Amino acid sequence: MGEYITACGISRKICTQGPDGMLKETLGGQPSIRKYVAHKIAQLENSDRDMRSLFRLMFSEKENVLAESTDGYKIRSLTYGESLENVRRKTARLAALLGGVPRGSVVGLCLANSPDWIETFWAILQAGYKPLLINDRLDDGTIADACAACGVKAAVSEGRQFGVRHIRLAQLLEDADASSVTDDRFENEIFLMSSNSSQHLKICGYTGEQFYHQILDSAAILRRCRAIKKHYKGRLKLLALLPFCHIFGLAAVYIWFCFFSRTLVFLKDLAPDTIVNTVRKHRVTHIFAVPLFWETVYKSALVRIRERGHRTYEKFLRGLKLCGVPLLGRLITRFGFREVRDNLFGESVCFCISGGGAISADVLRFVNAAGYPLSNGYGMTEIGITSVELSGSARVRMRGSVGAPFASAEYRIGDGGELFVRTPPAAKGLFCDGARTEQDGWFNTHDLFAVKRGRYYIQGRKDDLLVCSNGENINPDMTEQLFRADGVQRVCLLPSPRQSGKILLVAE
């Protein structure tokens, strides 16, 4: 039986951790989410803590639904058991296509988010190779440099080639005899490319041991935060929006939740209407995205509200200001902003995370006030995901904290305001400008942070500071948020190309 649970003041009929309903069918025979998580973690702790162990446990609930997608009409589902068989077939095909390539070599993976990405990722490992997760939005030169740095021998893609042996995805989809496939050659290392924000290409190596710690952190989050484990009508479904080739998408979306055999919902394309319609059609419960996504949601909603007239817009602004008030705010969210939810994602969304950069206070306030619990999080390719705000209070989430570091992580703020992180899930090896180094100890993120009452707040990036003629440092991330006006879509601070120490304000 389901029961009504209130999150941010919105009553929703959902199946809970009780013994009845659809939810129990997805818990591997365990009577509750808490016991199911404890059972899976105990299995992981008693394993070899490598990628093979992670693979076996991730696909152990074969009847659970791994993926959903739609062609616009019918929802298509893929179970973990069906996907497991696909992995075995892809492994057999890959082993044949990589004949002559020594096992232990690096194989590039350049695909968009899809069940094929997941299956090819595991097939590369099961065949005895190490995947390099390639961001297909990068230019050919950057990707070629990454392939050279890692010694990539072959790459799987839908068409792009990078000067190494090319394997088309279509070749892996051909039928193959998987009867001889075993996992005794399973590799235990993968490589991710950084976002290259520092203008230096970095490639980070991770093993099963690092993901073991990431999963322990996710289990601790599930114990501390009620919203993150909520199911809507017996199902927990994450929107597969973030690229799996990035640490945020790989760890927080795929590894965290698919280890516990939850469901991913894949998009046909990234058009705004497609995203909104997919969330509503599939009843997506969790959306993790970068700040730009949430800013787009906010601005689109404002446009629609303004179209309703000045009076409606003024009422909306007054309600928005009151949403941080504990009791009154919940009532406004529940009743006053119901129409906002009807025009956005509907009522199924239970938990959201913004990560990958600073998010404005206006956006946080709006999304939380609308009834979608949005928390700010933090992580980097080099260190994994290390913190997220877990408060059940909308007022706390609106402040923009990334919370306290996870149990496995330590934070320290240096004299210049830069955040240093020490954590077992950090990447073990780094390729930077072609040279490999082993990472150990405190990692300098070069991100500026402040800490208040144990909660950490992103202040910007040290590399982005602008130096004025009087020697004062200006932080664009903090300053740009002060320049808000009707009719202005975005603002940007830039150093003057003509006068040293002068700063230009550009508005659109």
Predicted regions and their residues:
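N-lobe entry segment of adenylate-forming
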Residues: 1-99, 103, 160
